[in-house]
Regions:
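Walker A/P-loop
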Residues: 16
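Small-molecule kinase domains that catalyze NTP-dependent phosphoryl transfer to phosphate-bearing small molecules
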Residues: 119-162, 170
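Short hydrophobic/aromatic beta-strand immediately N-terminal to the Walker A/P-loop
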Residues: 5-6
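Switch/connector loops and helix/strand junctions flanking conserved nucleotide-binding motifs
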Residues: 106-113, 158
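Glycine-rich phosphate-binding loop used to anchor ATP phosphates in small-molecule kinases
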Residues: 54-96, 102
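Conserved substrate/cofactor phosphate-moiety recognition/catalytic segment
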Residues: 19-66
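The Walker A (P-loop) glycine that initiates the GxxxxGKT/S ATP-binding motif of P-loop NTPases
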Residues: 9
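Walker A (P-loop) phosphate-binding loop of P-loop NTPases
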Residues: 12
Length: 170
């Protein structure tokens, strides 16, 4: 049975950057490091349809296929514990699931989102506000995660190290 580790966080907190660094450092050779953006599914195809709640399940099924025989370190903005437990039908090969929540200060989220390329459409006040609100949910829901990281004052290497150490301890 596979182990599934889900790193979830608001946009602009550094999920994808941390995933890339963890993959490069190769400290977790038994894990495939997979980002939601890399599974080949588009949220906008599901959004507002009767299949909206199927998106997370389809992403995980695809991640399971991509991972081959390896465990899965999966990075997602939307696959937080409530969404996972309410909407996801797990592939049968997944035996254990752990959640890592990550956030940073609202100021840091704003700075990071405004620095992204315009085509990512993350620099509007409404979008940034939505990520601040999502971040507040994370901060108020620390206990829903087996590991919770506030990376406001941490380097990428420190954050990656915390996550790697947690996963190795399982």
């Amino acid at each position: 049975m596979k182990t599934l580790i889900i790193l979830c966080a608001p946009c602009g907190v550094g999920k994808s950057t941390i995933r890339e660094l963890i993959a490069q450092r190769n400290q977790l050779p038994d894990f495939a490091c997979i980002d939601t953006d890399a599974v080949g599914l588009n949220w906008h195809v599901y959004k507002g349809t009767e299949r909206e709640n199927q998106y997370q399940t389809d992403c995980l099924k695809r991640a399971d296929e991509i991972s081959g025989d390896k465990n899965i370190f999966f990075v997602s903005a939307g696959m937080n514990p409530p969404n996972f437990y309410n909407y996801v039908d797990l592939p049968e090969l997944i035996g254990r699931t752990f959640f890592i929540g990550m956030t940073c200060s609202d100021e840091e989220i704003t700075k990071r989102l405004k620095a992204r390329p315009a085509e990512r459409r993350t620099d509007s006040d409404d979008f940034i506000k939505s990520q601040h609100e999502y971040s507040a949910w994370f901060k108020g829901s620390r206990g829903k995660f087996q590991l919770f990281v506030d990376n406001t004052n941490q380097t990428l290497e420190e954050t990656a190290g915390l996550i790697e150490d947690f996963i190795k301890s399982l």
